[in-house]
Amino acid sequence: MKILITGCRGQLGTELQRQLSAESCAIGPLPERLRKATVIPVDVDELDITDREATINYIRRHQPDTVINCAAFTNVDGCETARDAAFKVNAIGPRNLALACEKVNARLIHISTDYVFPGTANGGVALDECAVPAPISAYGQTKLLGEQYVERFCRRHFIVRTAWLYSAYGKNFVKTMIRLGQTHDKITVVNDQLGNPTNAVDLAYHILKLAISHDYGIYHCTGNGICSWYDFACAIMQGAGLSCKVEPVTSAEYAAANPASASRPAWSALENRMLRCTVGDEMRDWQDALKDFFANWNGEL
C-alpha cells in the first residue's frame, strides 16, 4: 500500500509517519494491511497543492493508493487578515488534491475542523455528522469550502473533522500553555468556549484505520469528553507540574483585550457517531490522552 501525506512536517503529518514506521501506537497495533506501507511524505517546498497542474502531475507520478491531506492554513486569527492565502490553502488545495485523486482512483482523506460550525449551544448536545455547518470565521469558511470541493470532485473521500489538536510536535495549545506556565505566575484563558481536546496519537490511529476502509463520508474524530479552554489549561498546568495560576475570562473580555482576534464558536463539541458506527471509536477520554502525552513527552517545546 502506498500512502502520500501532505503537510508532512506538521504535528499530525509527523505523527502519521511515526505510527506507520513503528506499526503501532499507544492505542494498539496498526491494521495488518498498513504494515510495510510505502509512505510518501511531502510538504510545500516539494509540492504546492494550490497549483492545480503541479498537484495533478505529482499524484500521477507517484500513484498513491491513499492521500492524507494534513496541509492547512490553521492560524485562525491570521486567516482574517490573509483571506486569499487561507482560501488558496484551505479550499483550492483540497480541490486540486480531489481532482488529482479522482484521476488515479486514490482515496482522499481530508482533515477539517470543528470551526465549520457556528457555536450555538445545541442544547448541550455534541454535534454529530448530521449537524449543519455555518462557520463564523474566515478559517471556518475556507475549511468548509475545502470540504465541499472534496465531496464534489473525489468519490472515494473521507472528510475528518477534528478539534483542539495537540501533539509532541509543532505548535499547539498544550505547548503554548506550558511555555506560559514556565514564565508567568498567572495567565487568563477563556472559559465559555467548549470543545474536545484531541491528542494527535488518537487522531492519526483512526485516520489510518479509515485508510483501509470503504465507508466513505464525513467523520468527526475528537477526544471523548467536553471541556472549556480554561479547563484544558488547568489540566495542562497540573500535568506539567507548574504552579502558574489560570484565571477564567469570558470570550467578550478576551475579544475586548484582543480586538484583532477572529470569532470562535462557543460550542463546537463533536460526537464521533460515524466513527463509532463504522471502523469503531477508540478515541480516548481527553484527560486520559493528555496524561499519556505527559507520560511520553520529552520536554521539547
Can you describe what each PLM-predicted range is?
Residues 1-26:
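N-terminal Rossmann NAD(P)H-binding glycine-rich loop of SDR-like oxidoreductase domains
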Residues 88, 93-96, 103, 107, ...:
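Catalytic helix-loop patch of NAD(P)-dependent Rossmann-fold dehydrogenases
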Residues 263-301:
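C-terminal amphipathic/interface module of NAD(P)-dependent oxidoreductases
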Residues 38-53:
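Rossmann-fold cofactor-recognition segment
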Residues 148-195, 201-202, 208:
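NAD(P)-dependent short-chain dehydrogenase/reductase
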Residues 206, 213-260, 294, 301:
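Mid/C-terminal beta-alpha module of Rossmann-like enzyme folds, strongest
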Residues 189-194, 219-226, 278:
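Glycine-rich Rossmann NAD(P)(H)-binding loop
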Residues 49-89:
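NAD(P)H-binding glycine-rich loop region in Rossmannoid oxidoreductase-like domains
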